[in-house]
Amino acid sequence: MNAPFTYASPTLSVEALKHSIAYKLMFTIGKDPVIANKHEWLNATLFAVRDRLVERWLRSNRAQLSQETRQVYYLSMEFLIGRTLSNALLSLGIYDDVKGALEAMGLDLEELIDEENDPGLGNGGLGRLAACFLDSLATLGLPGRGYGIRYDYGMFKQNIVDGRQKESPDYWLEYGNPWEFKRHNTR
C-alpha cells in the first residue's frame, strides 16, 4: 500500500465552508452564484459537506485495512435512509456553521434541506430495518458495509387515482446524487 501524501484537510470554519460551497457551485456544478437556483445551491452544499465526510471515511477504511479487521456486510433489497444532508451536518457537528455560511450568502439551510430528494432505495419496514442496522454499526464503531439495489426510478410512487392504486416512477435521481461516487469499473 502506498503511503498517504500530505494534504490540507478541509476546515470547518464558517468562512471555509462558505468558500467551499461557492467553489463547488462554480467548479463542480459550473454555475454562476448570481443565477444559481435553489437545487444547484443544495448540490454545492452537499458536495462541500461530502468532502468533509469522505476524509473521515477514507481514514476509517485505512485503519481497517492496516489492522485486517473483520467487517459486517449487510445485503438488503431496500435501504430507507431518508434525506441525508441534515444527518451528515449533525454527525459532523457543523450544522450551525453551514447554516451561518449559507446565511452569509443569502441562503436558508432549512429551505435547502427541504429541497433534497428522498433516495428511492426503499419504502417499507425492510428498508427502515436496514437503515437502523447500519446506523447501529456506525454508533458502535463496528466496521461494516451495506449493499443493495440502486433503483434508477426508485421503488415507485403509489397514488390513488379514481379509487384505484396507480404506480409511477420516482425520479429521485433527476438532479443526480452528490453523495454517490460513480464507479464505472464496477457493476
What is each stretch, according to the model?
Residues 1-187:
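A conserved ligand/cofactor-binding region detector
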